[in-house]
Regions:
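General structural concept
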Residues: 4-7, 14
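Hydrophobic or amphipathic alpha-helical targeting/insertion segments
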Residues: 12-55
Length: 274
């Protein structure tokens, strides 16, 4: 896809189109909008695109995003934000990034302000750090640490919001030997943790979740279809072949009734017909 026009562009200015430019490996390196000098038909634009690498006709072009691949060497169009090691996370990054997106520069719509986001990888191609400009005019940095299986066991988000304030959000996760989440902890600026835990049955289905002090149980029927969730704030039931409100029974997996209740309020129900 090299050029497209949506309904808003057509209605506002029939000469305005969205465009995409590609590199020699057929990857998008620039996207934006162009206002053509004259109104062109689809056939004329298709002919230009099919016969020349310079397929965008004359007009005023406004780039909205540039993408850099394969290298951490900045170009005229795309800067690169520096990697900074974070204690407890990767001390370095891989430079073998052929085929990977390394940096993206994006325009804030309606302005001449650009935001740059650079992504760093380990030698397995996993993201270990992203460094990006934020709308406050400062830098945000996200670090990730993995276990041998590739699960994220730690993540740290650092967002500088003023010259004197940086907010830090930290996550820690644990998994079982099948890669399923067992527990997670989140802290903001070193404060009290928000915790969650998960319990599974013998066939691997999630049957219990606990968020802080609120516990939710999850039920299934013998076919593995979800039949209900229950916690103090909210309860719900799904019925299939066993409706209680006069709806026709469904034996093929369609839901016949959905009942829910908030706290101690009266239960409500939908019945479905197919």
């Amino acid at each position: 896809l090299v050029m497209s026009q949506d309904g808003n562009q057509r209605a506002g200015d029939s000469k305005k189109w969205s465009y995409s430019l590609y590199d020699g490996k057929n990857r998008v390196v620039e996207t934006g909008e162009v206002v053509l000098t004259t109104t062109s038909t689809h056939a004329a634009l298709q002919s230009a695109a099919s016969s020349s690498l310079n397929y965008i006709p004359g007009g005023t072009r406004t780039a909205l995003q540039y993408t850099l691949y394969d290298t951490y060497t900045a170009t005229t169009d795309v800067p690169v934000r520096a990697f900074v090691p974070t204690t407890g996370y990767s001390a370095g990054y891989s430079t073998l990034v052929t085929g990977l997106v390394t940096s993206v520069k994006t325009r804030v719509l309606g302005t001449d302000t650009w935001l740059v986001a650079t992504t760093y990888y380990d030698d397995r191609g996993r993201v270990i750090q992203t460094v990006s400009d934020n709308l406050r005019g400062f830098t945000s940095r996200v670090d990730m640490k993995y276990d041998f299986a590739g699960n994220v066991v730690k993540q740290r988000e650092s967002h500088r919001v003023s010259a004197s304030q940086t907010d830090v959000l930290e996550h820690e996760n644990s998994y079982d030997d099948r890669g399923r989440l067992l527990s997670g902890t989140t802290r903001l600026n070193g404060g009290a943790p928000a915790t969650e835990s998960c319990t599974y049955d013998a066939v691997g289905r999630l049957i219990k979740q606990k968020h802080g002090n609120v516990e939710e149980t999850i039920n299934y029927n013998t076919r593995g279809w979800l039949t209900g969730k229950e916690s103090i704030p909210f309860k719900m039931k799904l019925r299939y072949e066993n409706p209680e409100g006069g709806t026709a029974a469904c034996w093929n997996g369609n839901i016949s009734e959905w009942e829910w209740q908030h706290g101690t309020s009266a239960a409500l129900m939908y019945g479905f017909m197919y």
